[in-house]
């Protein structure tokens, strides 16, 4: 409750990245004029880029019209010739902004605005009357006034505490959602409407507008992010002219998240959009898209909050491999590069993703990376965390992966045989012990001669190690005896040299 009070009462000044020069080479267009064009959104924890020049002063949103919301007739109650004028008047009504922290204050006006927004949504959705260009411009201005705003700071910024686990952190729900939802619905209906001419609409849904939408993805409210995801996806699909810009702008968000903040609420939603975009990539794949995989998607495995967005990230990665199987080696080596060392839950996620990637991997690409891959799998097999060891052993339940292993058993079995023996001899978990025994039997049936050779080499190595250890102990014992004699026959215990 304290967090919500702090969020409601403490809002930091807006500093939109839309008005800053991009540090990743994306030029930004001039802002549109008119109400709402200077309305910006930012998050207090996502300030200006490191070492960037100071941001220009941003104009505040225009104040709403004076007076109260004016009750207006329904569209069906006026002649068709007057509906455009009525549409504009209703848009003006919806430019009033209200304080939703006080549920009683302006209750009548809030309800009038809500009903008006519902009418506007129905009017656009019905397509009963095509709206003019001036009406479209005013509608986008009204939408901008309502949705583009300063986001409340994250809870740890108010309290000074370390950021909590993203999965456990209670999201902040926008109090004005009863109005905000309808504004988003209106924008969505406008974008998807068959009556919307992209040649006209792109004047108002321009690069500046798209950037401000992207800023809003940092909202903690999952309902808002869901609408933003759908709307941006539809904009990407309908406005082909914006596609390269949208991809680059999303890249910028990812770069900042990976290399600077590791804090952003909308990474999962942005990855969902990209998953659909990747699915539509034409073949042969452009170099730009391959670089996106290498420079953005693979490094996204590094941040600590990966558990929040891993499902969407894994889908994007697998889409790339399914589109172009030659990328499998690059992806697998990328996973190995960022493989977690001490985080067992994260390691389980990596093993699950690895299985999906291997399912789409062809033999030639598999052979390129199988040595480092099975060295890592071997380490997972002997993990003291039984869930990690189990998850690694479950790879042998996949027929495609077993087929790849069988084709390259002469290389793979010598790598993992020692780990199989170690599990059988000393792993504390009975389930891991049983699964390891099954895999050992599988290799024995797959190639008895190779299995016996690996067993012989393992036994020889163990015997040699035992011999070396005995020799080491004997050497230390001789040194201890020599030291005792040198000191005049003193007690051996006082002069024992320990290894």
Curated annotation (Swiss-Prot):
Tissue specificity as recorded in UniProt: Expressed ubiquitously, higher levels in cotyledons and flowers.
Top-level taxon in the UniProt lineage: Eukaryota
Region Disordered: start-end pairs: 1-65
Molecular function terms from GO: protein phosphatase regulator activity
Biased composition (Basic residues): 1-13
Location(s) in or outside the cell: Nucleus; Cytoplasm
Pfam families: B56
Keyword annotations: Brassinosteroid signaling pathway, Cytoplasm, Nucleus
GO biological process terms, semicolon-separated: brassinosteroid mediated signaling pathway; megasporogenesis; meiotic sister chromatid cohesion; microsporogenesis
GO cellular component: cytoplasm; nucleus; protein phosphatase type 2A complex
SUPFAM superfamilies linked: ARM repeat
Coiled coil, from the record: none
InterPro entries: ARM-like, ARM-type_fold, PP2A_B56
Role: The B regulatory subunit may modulate substrate selectivity and catalytic activity, and may also direct the localization of the catalytic enzyme to a particular subcellular compartment. Required for the formation of the PP2A holoenzyme that positively regulates brassinosteroid signaling by dephosphorylating and activating BZR1.
Family assignment from sequence similarity: Belongs to the phosphatase 2A regulatory subunit B56 family.
Subunit description: PP2A consists of a common heteromeric enzyme, composed of a catalytic subunit (subunits C), a constant regulatory subunit (subunit A), and a variety of regulatory subunits such as subunits B (the R2/B/PR55/B55, R3/B''/PR72/PR130/PR59 and R5/B'/B56 families). Interacts with BZR1. Interacts with BRI1. Interacts with SRK2E/OST1.
Designated name of the protein: Serine/threonine protein phosphatase 2A 57 kDa regulatory subunit B' beta isoform
Organism: Arabidopsis thaliana
Gene: B'BETA
